A protein has these predicted regions:
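Short coil/linker segments at helix-helix boundaries
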Residues: 2-36, 46-82, 92-127, 144-152, ...
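Surface-exposed substrate-engagement region within the catalytic domains
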Residues: 123, 131-135
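Long hydrophobic alpha-helical segments typical of transmembrane helices together
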Residues: 138-183
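A broadly tuned, weak detector of single residues within folded domains
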Residues: 38, 84, 160-161
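"A position-specific structural signal for the A-helix of alpha-solenoid helical repeats
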Residues: 2, 43, 50, 89, ...
Length: 183
């Protein structure tokens, strides 16, 4: 629950970093206690992934965070192949790395590929077609990898997300975020 509360709240950046790092650490304890529970692995990836997004790419890569995130997402999907959030996160993992360091280096060093980002994001949407975050994150992945070349496609995904009816408070926040991006 802490993970859901951190994202939309305007807070001190150091406090956010500390909280995301804490999520990753608690998830590691959960992984040790519940190694066959997919969400133990997923929340480690989530916490470390969000933490990584807040620090410099050089720092995140030097700390081995990309490998840890990928390892956790792979474990999640091995246990639960239809885990839509993990599919979305793995798509974004590929997109973040390709977008930040380029396709060739991303592929050779981390196995990250633009085509894999596309594949995982599309599968997440197929698994959860009414999920605003799956649409939003796919739009973000397109922009990270392709920039302005895919702006129209990304805008269409945001527009589709905005039209969805939220099923809970987090989805309402996701839709509000999409609306703000479109403004």
């Amino acid at each position: 629950s802490q993970a859901v509360m951190i994202l939309p709240q305007p807070q001190d950046e150091k406090e956010k970093l500390k909280r995301f790092e804490g999520i990753g650490q608690r998830a590691e304890m959960a992984m040790a206690a519940l190694p066959k529970e997919a969400n133990s692995h997923y929340f480690r990836a989530f916490g470390l992934g969000r933490y990584s997004q807040m620090i410099s790419i050089a720092k995140a890569l030097s700390q081995g965070l990309a490998s840890k995130v990928k390892e956790s997402l792979d474990a999640t999907l091995k246990l639960a192949p239809k885990h839509a959030e993990a599919q979305t996160a793995l798509g974004l993992y590929h997109a973040e790395i390709v977008g930040k360091i380029g396709g060739m280096i991303a592929s050779l060093t981390y196995g990250a590929k633009a085509a894999s980002a596309d594949e995982h994001c599309k599968l997440a949407i197929k698994l959860t077609p009414e999920s605003p975050i799956a649409l939003i994150e796919y739009a973000n992945a397109l922009m990270l990898i392709h920039g302005d070349k895919k702006e129209d496609e990304a805008a269409a995904l945001y527009a589709k997300a905005i039209k969805l009816k939220p099923k809970d408070a987090m989805e309402a926040l996701d839709i509000a975020h999409a609306k703000a991006q479109m403004a």
